[in-house]
């Protein structure tokens, strides 16, 4: 008998057929339980912000400057300088960000993990991170990988003569991959038009995706699906970069600025390249893409398959990209690897070789580079940058800072001595609090006035929820701070019930004005604080209605943003298309409503128990959009009871879909057939899904009322303060 057959661990945990294999459509709650303390080696007492603030950032930068020109034989530096490689590393770390759900980006150092560490577009960035390991090892916990990747990109630019806009630390590492939807394709770089294509109709890209192919960060540099058409490529570029929060000017600046440096690599056929890191053998120690082409490195390196050096100054900031773009006519050719690229017609060989100082090459460009000349809007910007180098430098500096900091959230999270003083609109700025805050006695007085104003528990709770639940843990945007719910576009969102919202805000503003006018010594309450405080008052009243005396925690300190401080277009991506906590769907979607609920809960950083108790509480408090009765399983509305769970789990009720809408259900008395309740998929999933039913049973038990109230108050307080980074 073989040793393998004798192994007592043949059925080791995790090796068998999984639930997902048996039931691929089962609702997956695992995304709610990522990044727990169990996967974090730092320990519960470690505070990364405090560690970073003690870091000698200047010393780190000196070490990075030295690294740039210390070429290693195992992966030699192009032109004797690693700047181009490290710019690409930082760019690709940040460039996964997409505006639709705020996921991706540099904020967690996810480039270290699958799938990103093995995406074709990230080929050989494993070497860049290995080059950085001695510096990461030296400074240890004081600088995260997430911060180091971006800082290295900045230093790369600075070491080649470019003045950056600034750098902010504060990106704490995570220790496992994010579960992010990157597309449905089953093949790397699969072209559009297949059964799993991300495109439909007239090349309409699926939301929330931004990249054009599975395994790419942005667009295909050879053109759409490899078609070398610069004008068609411009359409892809505009769509993709817009989905990554960049306008046309920022897009041109980033492409031209980034392609001022370094080169691409396509010395030979891609068939020579080995497996990516996650598929490589254990002896490779996490490195991938081992090439059998000649030496496999340096002048023989194969990465994208393209062989392009854009400028005569690949290790120095210049304006040569635009000089070449407009100074030559271009003809289509192929790289040694067979990839479509462009070469300057009749040009002299003026481009330096990366490793042989005696060799020169003709200027070359990518299809997507030529888009900056042949798309009319891009050309106009490009010519202006060509004629005004200082505008180009400023635009690139600002766009690079935005690219590398877009997912960090508000400036309150920025750390370090290089944080720029200028406040930028895309940071969703909120004024600093410049007055004394209310105390506990003031809060009690204000709550009493709110409850005496005629506003209902439902109105108070739903308004506070609408303000706070815009928060996204992905890119740290949204939340109640700033009171942007009173501004465009939030005040007009369908989910926020504009007519009711306007009436509630008018009442709260009158209470606020009267209170502030009666104060001495400058004490004030902001509308942002009052919206949250009013919601807390509503929860307390609802608990009282259910026979429980509770005090909901409240921390003042929010401020009110102005319309001028609010980018309406940028803010629009926060509009909920689905909010299961309010039983709201803006339209009909292919994705089931319960999946959208879990997605929303994950963006709110909720666990499955938190999601469960929160939804059950909001139902009985009447927080549904449009005062819908779906899921309001109680006769004691606006009382904080566990009735949602009690009645959902009642075996005396039989559920069937309605004839009019298969996603809406009627609950009828099993004996009489009398209609008792109506509910949606989001409601019924707490009785049908085995894990969620187990949680519902906890809160539906006879002894659960007190625990239900306590747990609801805790998670309510959590959501109200998700954007209060000043309290951390």
From Swiss-Prot:
InterPro entries: Catalase_peroxidase (IPR000763), Haem_peroxidase (IPR002016), Haem_peroxidase_sf (IPR010255), Peroxidases_AS (IPR019794), Peroxidases_heam-ligand_BS (IPR019793)
Residues carrying the site annotation Transition state stabilizer: 88
EC number: 1.11.1.21
Keyword Heme appears in the UniProt entry: yes
Positions contributing to heme b binding: 259
GO biological process: cellular response to hydrogen peroxide; hydrogen peroxide catabolic process
Cofactor detail note: Binds 1 heme b (iron(II)-protoporphyrin IX) group per dimer.
Cross-link (Tryptophyl-tyrosyl-methioninium (Trp-Tyr) (with M-244)): 91-218
Catalytic activity: H2O2 + AH2 = A + 2 H2O; 2 H2O2 = O2 + 2 H2O
Residues at the catalytic site: 92 (proton acceptor)
Cofactor(s) required for function per UniProt: heme b
Pfam families in alphabetical order: peroxidase (PF00141)
Covalent link Tryptophyl-tyrosyl-methioninium (Tyr-Met) (with W-91), residues: 218-244
A GO term from the CC aspect: cytosol
MF annotations from Gene Ontology: catalase activity; heme binding; metal ion binding
Entries under CDD domains matching the protein: catalase_peroxidase_1 (cd00649), catalase_peroxidase_2 (cd08200)
Superkingdom of origin organism: Bacteria
PANTHER family assigned: CATALASE-PEROXIDASE, HYDROPEROXIDASE I, BIFUNCTIONAL CATALASE-PEROXIDASE
Family per similarity comment: Belongs to the peroxidase family. Peroxidase/catalase subfamily.
Protein function: Bifunctional enzyme with both catalase and broad-spectrum peroxidase activity.
Subunit comment: Homodimer or homotetramer.
Name of the protein in question: Catalase-peroxidase
Organism: Burkholderia mallei (strain ATCC 23344)
Gene name per UniProt: katG
